[in-house]
Amino acid sequence: MRWRSTLLVASGLLCVACGPISKLPPLVSEEVEAGRRKQQVDHIRDYFAQRARLNNVALRIRIANNLDCRNRSTQIGLDAGTVPSLPRKFRSYSQEALSVSWTQATVISVAETSPATAAGIKPGDHLMTFNNEAVPRTDTSAWISHFVDNNGEQPIRVLVRRDGVDEIRTITTVKACAISVELITDSSPNAF
């Protein structure tokens, strides 16, 4: 019995050794890099599209449950940033994927029923100032959240640049639950 299994393994190895050899054509490094770049750009666009959908739902939930929350804050319902303010893994292709500026805060997404939408702010707009205070190019999203929270329920005059034209938009803030909602890219379940 043992000699049969040895013979079977040996004949299998012999057949593998006598099989045809295939060679893949050489790949051009520029084509490989272009494919990698396209994958990264698509990944960034997909991630921020999912994040925008999540923010739409989260803002509605926060506003609807406003009276039931212990911790509340004022919110305007937009996500903005500059290339340096984005997470490091998104910086290299974010300008191409999202048209985000290096120096001016660019609106990445606006929640559908948000105060920012009511004020006419759209993705791609550049946010120059909030109540004549310049929007910084680093930690942009955190700065906006902090500014809106400190401003309270007072309207915010935002200088918006769209297609090279500056306009003042007035955003009337809304009180909402101050619960954190984040999009995490992890395959393990974290909610039950």
Explain the meaning of each model-derived region:
Residues 58-69, 120, 131, 147-151, ...:
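Sec/Tat-exported extracytoplasmic proteins
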Residues 8-16:
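Bacterial N-terminal signal peptides
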Residues 1-7:
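Bacterial N-terminal signal peptides that target proteins for export
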Residues 116-139:
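Conserved PDZ fold ligand-binding element
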Residues 37-50, 110-115, 134:
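Second-shell loop/turn segments in exported
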Residues 48-105, 170-189:
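PDZ/PDZ-like peptide-tail recognition elements
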Residues 17-39:
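Bacterial Sec signal peptide processing site at the extreme N-terminus
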Residues 143-184:
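PDZ-domain C-terminal substructure recognizer with occasional recognition of PDZ-binding tails
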